Amino acid sequence: MSGVNTTAASQDACYISLLGLAEYFRTSQPPNIKKCIQCLQALFTFQPPSKVEARTHLQMGQVLMAYTRNIDLARQHLEQAWSISEPLMNFDDVKFDTASLLAQLHLQTEQSSHAKAMLRRAVELSQNNVYWHCKLLLQLSQIHANDREYSLASDLLAVGAESAEEAGATYLKVLFLLSRAMILMIERKTNDVLALLNSAGQIIDNNIPNPHQKEYLKVFFLVLQVCYYLALGQVKTVKPSLKQLQMSIQTIMAPNWPSDEVIFGANQLEMFVWLPKEQLYVLVYLVTVSHSMMAGYMDKAQKYTEKALTQIEKLKLQEDKSILSVFKVILLEHIVMCRMVMGNRELAIREIAAARDVCIAAPHRNLLKRHSAQLHCLIGLYSMSTSFFEHAERQFLVCVNETGERDLKLFANLNLAIIYLRTKREADLKQILDAVSTENTHTYSSQALMGGFYYVQGLHAFHKNSFHEAKRFLRETLKMANAEDLNRLTSCSLVLLSHVFLSIGNSKESMNMVTPAMQLASKIPDIHVQLWGSAILKDLHRMSKDAQHEKEAYANHVKYSENLIADQRKCVQSAHHELVNWFQGDPPVTSGASLNLPVAVATTEASTSAIQQPAQFGQFY
């Protein structure tokens, strides 16, 4: 009997020695992965017990996934680990770690259905282990969300919230509630989102004793609340929540704030973090940029974009997480529209090319698949602003066909309507306006986009010389824009209304409209309105025989025109201008002036698209 014990002890010593040696080689500088794998492989020659064998296969899979490109061998080891550990009792960490890693591996090889099947089985087996059950539910719901299977993701998160509640894990329950609210927001289930946010908000206020976890949850809650209001175009309503969010993130980023490891490391059921604080910091910048864009504060949007992009570059140097690329693309999408509003279209096309580069560089083209429609939309806006209307039309049509996002589709259709209006295609215009009207009658869309819809109808009526009808639509637009401080929509509506009054000979009302339009336009700044308004002012001053002011208005008009012409020349000479011809497949790689980070502030100004909308369409999940 003592001989058996001696042999077992000797084997144990061998296992420990080989594992120690493997870890030594793995953590060497630089790591010696070949020798690490050889040490782990040597363990199998001793015919170890099932649990040791399963754990070693898991470790082999982990090392191969982390340090090599040998996906097939990693899969073989993980599948071995799973087949051995699945029936074993009291072996949860190896069993479920293996399932989680195998699911990740299936995703890397674009086998989403295999990943879901693996995790569903693991979720079923983990019901007596709250930590793993919740972790696997979160992982599975994330995959369903990425595949746009939002109802399934939502159901899994509801199960997670119940499991956390049964285990008395309040912090974890709130994480599930907020994650579910995020999914419902993407689904546009407005009432359900409000109910969940209210429920989560009350728990955060009253039932989270740890002040650091409370502040962290508050940031998550406020990010969702701000995004909820912005998705509805409620720029004014959101201000108190945004201010609170900015204060909360400053608290979390303070030097005396404990690290995430300290806050979330004490209790296994509190080891769940939505985003680390450094990424939350970037996200708060991002929603602030979105708010500034919608409110019509282009300078602010540019300033915060530059800060966010600089922060992203710093984080990428530490660890290049995929979510940083998502943030970067969304920020670039926003800043592109800032440039076009201000008139710097040549810089806009450079930034579109930069967004394309980020998308192409992401693994498995995942980012390109998610943002292709937005890129087409941005190129459509650029083409439109440089008077390449045929290209713009095709870009918007590709966007409409590719996207499942209702707001992006509406935005592209409204810009298509403006193209049809400018190119005098009455039948196409009527068809698109009727379709937009039908689609949005029974749904609660963004205030900004619906205001834009009324604006386009007002523009259409103006072009038909139906001035009374134009006034009716534009007053509706102004009512919506003023209610939520949508400054760009207000200035566009005022300048068009001024033109309507000028056309019917009411110079007094025309002046009453164009004056605030120009004041707002210079604050934004929006050369589209400034160019239009200066032409109206020139005519009004001529009619009133005010030669001095007429001369000033004319000089301003010439200045804006010359800026546009100079920028147009730069655009057509840019290598990136070739992107206007991208209609399918991967975008072409263009070599031209590259983008320097942080982004430089625009110096020239122009835009021809009548309405703009932030490019974040619920894709922050």
Curated annotation (Swiss-Prot):
Gene3D superfamilies: Tetratricopeptide repeat domain. InterPro entries: MAU2, TPR-like_helical_dom_sf. TPR repeats lie at residues 96-129, 451-484, 491-524. Keywords: Cell cycle, Cell division, Chromosome partition, Mitosis, Nucleus, Repeat, TPR repeat. The keyword Cell cycle applies. GO terms for cellular component: chromatin; nucleoplasm; nucleus; SMC loading complex. It is found in: Nucleus, Nucleoplasm. SUPFAM superfamilies: TPR-like. GO terms for biological process: cell division; chromosome segregation; maintenance of mitotic sister chromatid cohesion. Required for association of the cohesin complex with chromatin during interphase. Plays a role in sister chromatid cohesion and normal progression through prometaphase. Belongs to the SCC4/mau-2 family. Interacts with Nipped-B to form the cohesin loading complex. This is MAU2 chromatid cohesion factor homolog.
